[in-house]
Amino acid sequence: AANRHLCGSHLVEALYLVCGNRGFFYIPSKMGIVEQCCDTPCSLYDPENYCN
């Protein structure tokens, strides 16, 4: 998959997609995922690091 910017609701959708039933922890102020996927493009595999 090509790297892409994932911000806001798109980022949440990507987390639901890759984490599925495992769920994920979404605390924007304590996570680097916004910097990793919104400020700079990330692959769709990167959000998996934030699954429960």
UniProtKB/Swiss-Prot annotation:
Its main location: secreted. It is found in: Secreted. Disulfide bonds join C7-C38, C19-C51, C37-C42. InterPro entries: Insulin, Insulin-like, Insulin-like_sf, Insulin_family. GO terms for cellular component: extracellular space. GO terms for biological process: glucose metabolic process. The keyword Cytoplasm does not apply. Keywords: Carbohydrate metabolism, Disulfide bond, Glucose metabolism, Hormone, Secreted. Gene3D superfamilies: Insulin-like. One of its GO terms (molecular function) is hormone activity. Heterodimer of a B chain and an A chain linked by two disulfide bonds. Insulin decreases blood glucose concentration. It increases cell permeability to monosaccharides, amino acids and fatty acids. It accelerates glycolysis, the pentose phosphate cycle, and glycogen synthesis in liver. Belongs to the insulin family. PANTHER family: INSULIN, INSULIN/INSULIN GROWTH FACTOR. This is Insulin.
